[in-house]
Amino acid sequence: MKQEEAVRAAAALGSPFGGRFFLYDLSAEAPDFSEDVPILLMNPKGLYFGPAVSAARSVRDAETPVGVSFGNGDTFVTTLEAVGEYDELLGAGAVVVIGCSNTRFLEDEDGDVCGIVSGE
């Protein structure tokens, strides 16, 4: 799934998640979209574990979906488990993960899409 496709797929999840998405790009090469697609996008380029953990923590009280994408194969599950908030955030439908490659949808126990994972 290409980056733009992943972003648009996540944007489509905005209503079920009940939250807003914000554009946030950590790389110098921000994607250029012809339409305004508000989404939280963390580019794998230059993204390390520390900033990802900080981003995961930042949504705890903000009720804002957070995207965490890694270039080394890690996923948001590892990140959120590290800060002890996986169940809380996933239960609140507050996590969406966007990536440029190796992107797949994440389903909960009921088979409902609850996020997008980028990783190997």
What positions do the PLM features span?
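A contiguous loop/helix-start segment that scaffolds small-molecule binding in enzyme catalytic cores
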Residues: F33-E120
